């Protein structure tokens, strides 16, 4: 019988000690998420993790590490969001980024890196038409809370590398 080996990008990059530090930060209710982001930077730097900051959402922080997006939960809702994205990414393909891995508690998720749309691309009528079609297709089966075609949502849209697929 042939054995299949699984690889964890998270466990390759982050020691158990580092994961514990990040977990303690996430569970610290005395620190707001904006400050948690800054503390997360300090922790990653202490452990010599090479990353490029991408940006914050309400409950998570994204950083580019070795060509992948690592989404760090900043609170319990961020942990749930990471697990939810992992659970639903396959049935929602090709309309959402691929989530390759998530820790069981949702602390960190590893996702596909896509090029973000510019505001000009977002406002292009042909692009908006495709976005409406995507929202119609996935909206029939899934509730999508933070995606729309309002200008405040433009950073939630991007292009899959080497394709014209809109995500």
Model region roles, listed by residue range:
Residues 63-67, 113, 160:
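Active-site beta-strand termini and strand-to-loop segments that position acidic
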Residues 69-70, 107-109, 164-166:
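Hydrophobic residues embedded in beta-strands of well-ordered beta-sheets
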Residues 57-58, 104, 152-154:
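Short, surface-exposed coil-to-beta transition loops
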Residues 147-167:
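Catalytic activation segment of kinase domains across protein kinase-like and atypical kinase folds
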Residues 2-50:
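Juxta-kinase regulatory segment immediately upstream of eukaryotic protein kinase catalytic domains
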Residues 140-147:
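Protein kinase catalytic-loop region centered on the HRD/HxD motif
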Residues 94-135:
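Conserved structural core of kinase catalytic domains
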Residues 50-97:
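ATP-binding glycine-rich loop module of kinase domains
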């Amino acid at each position: 019988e042939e054995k299949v080996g699984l690889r964890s990008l998270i466990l390759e990059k982050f020691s158990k000690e580092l994961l514990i530090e990040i977990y303690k930060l996430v569970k610290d209710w005395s620190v707001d998420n904006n400050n948690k982001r800054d503390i997360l930077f300090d922790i990653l730097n202490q452990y010599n993790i090479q990353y490029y900051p991408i940006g914050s959402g309400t409950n998570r922080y994204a950083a580019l590490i070795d060509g992948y997006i690592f989404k760090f939960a900043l609170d319990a809702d961020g942990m749930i969001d990471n697990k939810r994205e992992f659970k639903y990414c396959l049935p929602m393909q090709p309309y959402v980024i691929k989530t390759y891995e998530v820790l069981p508690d949702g602390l960190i998720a590893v996702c596909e890196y896509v090029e973000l749309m510019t505001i000009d691309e977002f406002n292009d009528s042909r692009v908006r038409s495709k976005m409406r079609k995507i929202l119609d297709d996935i909206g029939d089966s899934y509730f999508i809370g933070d995606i729309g075609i309002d200008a405040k949502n433009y950073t939630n849209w991007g292009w899959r590398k080497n394709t014209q697929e809109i995500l």
